[in-house]
Every structure is written in C-alpha cells, then in structure tokens.
Amino acid sequence: MSTNRYAIEIGKNGGYEFFTAFFNNSLNYNRFYQKIPQDTAIDIVRANIIQPNQEFLNNKNIERHVNKNNNLDTKKYNVVLIMIESLSAKFMGKFGNTESITPNLDKLADDSIFFTNFYATGTRTVRGLEAVTLSVPPTPGSSIIRRPNNTNLFNASTIFKKAGYDISFIFGGYSYFDNLNKFFSSNNYKVIDRSDFSSEEISFSNVWGVADEDLLFKALGELDKNYKAGKPFLSLIMTTSNHRPYTFPDGRIDLPSGGGRNAAVKYTDYAIGKFFEEARKKEWFKDTIFVITADHCAASAGKVNLPVAQYHIPLMIYNPHILKPKQIDNLASQIDIIPTVLGLLNLPHTTKLWGTDILNFPANRAFISTYQLLGYMKDEHLIILAPNSKAKAYQLSGTNQYEIDDNVGNLTHEAISFFQAASSFYENGELVEKSF
C-alpha cells in the first residue's frame, strides 16, 4: 500500500475529496503535501527569519520584537505603496526592453533603491496583495483574501496602526471583486474604491475600473486629506488599466487605446509619471516613502510547471530627499516589502510577519506559486511542492531550470517548513492579530 497520503486519499474516494477541496478555494496542506514534523518545521522557519535586531517572544511560533537601530533616526515617514497591475519586469527598459514603453518607471528606477531580483508570489492580484499585506508565504489553494477566517489578521496595518498611522486601500475597481472590501475593511484599512468616485472624477473607465490617471489623481486628494489631519499615513494603491481589454483615455500616449498589452503598459507608465509630477509639488512629498511594484506578471504560462521568469517583477523604493539611489541584486519576494520599509522607518515594533528586511538582512530567497504548486527559490535552486508527489529539486540557470536528484535536502526541508508552517498557522488561527 502506498505511504503517500495523496495516493491513499485518491485511492479511497476516486479523487472526490481532492477536487472538492480544489473547487472550494482551499487545499489542506497536511492532507495533500509532503510534510516533516511540525516542531521541526517551526524551528527551521524561526532559524531562517530571525534577524540580529530581533528576539523571539516565545519558543513556539514566530512572534518577535524588532529593535530600532540606535545609530539611526526614527521618523514616522508616510508610506505610499503602488501596486501596478501585471507589470512584468520584462516590460521595463531597465530590464532590457527596447520598445520604450516605460520611460517614467525607468527614470524612477534610476532615482530609487532599485531591486533587480524580485519576485511575485503568485499569478493573481489577490495573491500579490496577500503577500504584501500579510507578509506570509503562499499557501495551497486560493489567496487567504478569498478564504474564510481572514479577518483581524496580523498584517502591515497592525504595526502601522499601533504607530498612529492612518491606513487606506485605494482601488480603481469595485472592491467587492475577489472579496477585497471584506478583507481590507476587517483588517484596519479604510477602503476607497470605484463607488467613491464622483462622475467628475472619472475621465474613462472599463469593466475593470477607472483609468489609472483617475485613480492616482483621486489618491493624491486622499493623501492631501491625511496630511491635513496631521497623521502619518500608509496607503496601498492598486491600479487596473494594464488588463484586458487594455483600454484607456485617448490622446495620452502614442499608442491607441485597445492596442494591446504594450499600449496599456505605456499608458500606466504615463499615469505614474503624472502622479509623481503632482506629488512632488505636495508638502507631504519630502516625508513620504514611495514603493512601486507589481501584483504579478502579465503571464505565467511556460514550458515548465513554475517558470521563474514569469514571476519576475520590479521593486522600487523612492524618496529623493532621504534615500540615495542604488541597485540591489539580492533575491527577494513580495513578503519582504513591509519588513524592509519598517527597517527604513527604524520603528521598534512587535511582529508576526514572515518577511525580512532585505536592505539590512537579506534572506536571498523567494516564494512563487500557482493554485497547487508551491515554489521556493534559493542558492540557484528551485524546490517545488505539488499535491501528488514528493518535493522536486531544480537547478536554475538563467531562464532555464533542470530537474536534479534531491541532493539539496536541507533546502527541501526549508521549503517544506515554510509552506507547512504558514498553512498550519492559517488553519489554526495563528495568523490572527493578538495583543502583545
């Protein structure tokens, strides 16, 4: 008899249980994926996420205190995080594109802390938003944003709210899409979406949302309100224009509305340029850290199960008054964004986030995934966990990957540990916000 739990379950019920789970947004890790003892998994995770400026609060989970750097000032800078729909790294001139469709983003990269080896955790907007807000590795099935028991979770807003920040999620579409309204409103975010735009504030819209320029102009007004209220702010802005049918206002760029992906990318780049042109005039600009990244790539299909190049996205952290431009080539992932920003703020805090400060303590690893496949990248290797087999190891070489014998056992255990622990923490309610 097979010792593989997946094979046993399929043998018992002809796949009913697996496919029921599949179509209900959740695949139970313990039932369908390779495991190691839970205590061992948690110990491995703890060893991999602890930073020299942190100490654990107990010996059973990842709760830890983050100390400030006494050699640096602490200041509550505003944080504006712009997630651009489907902005693959390959669209930018900084990554070798020769079609001149991202002139504003390329200039921004030159003036920013620019991360060249940065990866999305998944292939859907909700997976990217999950990674950035919760700073948690992807779990099997759908994003936590679309699953039950996702309210009052420990997330970026938990830390910023305690520090006195006003917190908002600004979206160009209707936030009932993919359960965004429920998730964000029940996790400390004020939600501003398409329903909050007056007709005068919309120059163009399509099925996905208002034009990116309208969204970003609306965001400027909201940030002005926050500044006038005298509170620092954390604002997460999600664009929509770089999405089929790729339509946008006429007369903005030299490519036509509906002209395909390149046209939509260039339009979004135009809107970003206009946003920063206006933002630089604001009194709050010099005290605001801007983070620009993508939710996921434009495509995820490839000749292999997890084509690494189809998860490669840009990350820029920008403020010309306080941050010196530089290029960072360390491997990193969307779950590292908020811990890195908190490192720049130098705010002491208690955390349950899974990411690391990649400017000061880079982990040099990344997480990628589909609905079923879970990938862990480190040391030029990719470990893939699937619900119907043991973990497989691949050697990475440029954009190519080659399956190898499992001679990277420690790395395989790391991969299993992160995905197993993250899944069990979600299932057991350990991602929930608690008083420290």
How would you label these PLM feature ranges?
Residues I50-F436:
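Solvent-exposed soluble domains appended to multi-pass membrane proteins
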Residues M1-Y77, A109:
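N-terminal secretory/membrane-targeting segments
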